[in-house]
């Protein structure tokens, strides 16, 4: 196993998720914090992932979790991930204000850590506007569900923090619909052509379509090699703090 996402659409014993399921309606809602980021067990998990050479994936986690993993949490005595994490399928909050997307304050931490945001093609995460329905989940906007909007997300990250820190994370295997013009991987040349048409250099386009991920993966391997020389594997059971699973929703036995 070479990478793992720290959560899905539910809190767990290790981290807070961005979105959870409302127990009454069954609808997804913006989450309320459980751990306020990474739990004590989560710090152990991330340390062992670093030692093993596993990519730490921040797609699906809350902003507090993003911040803890990228910048550490001094109160907990947690220095964050020693290797750069990735967002394997997330987009830009400033363009589409979905809790799953990455806000600007976190994008700046992505740059500091040499990390990577891979833009998700899910229509709900690329084309949306604020909603007043009380869920914290924005309203989908059909007219912007296009290849051009995906390019807008990519270029936003590239222009804000540099093209070393943006990639493509389609989520084709996890979504039911796609942006117009990006129905499948055969449309990738059109995406690259649109980036070039907007003035993105050949070199930067190459980073976006793969070289950035290879760079991050190389750094993850280098960190693992260093840690394995001085750090023993975590073989004890990680204490979960009374956390148990209840379907897709976790709860604490207090």
PLM feature spans:
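Active-site beta-loop-alpha junctions enriched in small/polar residues
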Residues: 7-11, 54, 59-66, 90-93, ...
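Histidine/acidic-residue-rich, glycine-tolerant segments that coordinate divalent metal ions
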Residues: 8-24
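Histidine/acidic residue-rich metal-binding segments in metalloenzymes
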Residues: 19-86, 99-114, 148-164
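Conserved, mostly hydrophobic/aromatic
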Residues: 56, 89, 117, 171, ...
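Aromatic-lined glycan-binding groove of carbohydrate-active enzymes
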Residues: 100-137
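Short acidic/histidine-rich active-site segments
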Residues: 120-121, 160-185
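Outer-membrane beta-barrel pore domains
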Residues: 128-129, 134-147, 172-182, 194-204
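Mid-to-C-terminal alpha-helical segments outside catalytic/metal-binding sites
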Residues: 183-254
